[in-house]
Amino acid sequence: MDTIRLTIDGQQIEVPEGTTILEAARTADIYIPSLCFHPDLPPAKDHPAVEAVFHGHHKIENAHPEQSGKGCGICVVEVAGNSELAGACATAAVDGMVVTTQNERIEAKRRENLLSIMARHRHACLTCAQRDGCSLSPCSTDVPENERCCEQFGHCELQQVANFVGIPDTTPRWVPTDYPVFKDDPLFERDYNLCIGCTRCVRACRDLRGIEALGFVLDENGQAQVGTVAETLDDSGCKFCTACVA
């Protein structure tokens, strides 16, 4: 296989042709934050939405059928010669390319994109001044339990990315969405209140397993809403392989 050479943050890197900027950076231990990327999955950007998804009996229709997935937008970088920032997870590295992963413009855009994710996800624990020594319960700042910690606290990808990118001061308080929590299915529970719309579960179901029991639509604000393609996992064709939660 042919190889190419590119420069990322002043470091010259040689990778196989077809490698993305994000993958190239990781071969050189250059960290580019991301939430929707997974090495075994195709990029979230341009992944097709479906006509409708279900949260149990509640049907959610696609408000933007002309659009496809956008990805999280956290992995944006600058490519010399391009006026627009590029998503590192979906942009192929090109021979001679010069990439910058950290500067004021990039950091501002990442914070902007993170804000749109944080605004629809419980995040009180990520902004709490006492989060490093928190015992999770009771809350010393009297934040209601449904607005704060989940079981992933301390081991959460969103928390790690937020710590690196920086949580915008303008992040509004999360308003509880009261999405349903499904506990009756075998092997795993589904709590849509914790979904950040990364669509990794959707892509794992479709591209790793070839099942397509899960899908996503775009709501009125263009945000991804994930759900099953029928009212139940069984009716959606789920095999309970757990690829979506692995």
Positions of PLM-derived features:
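Ferredoxin-type iron-sulfur electron-transfer modules and their immediate structural context
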Residues: 1-246
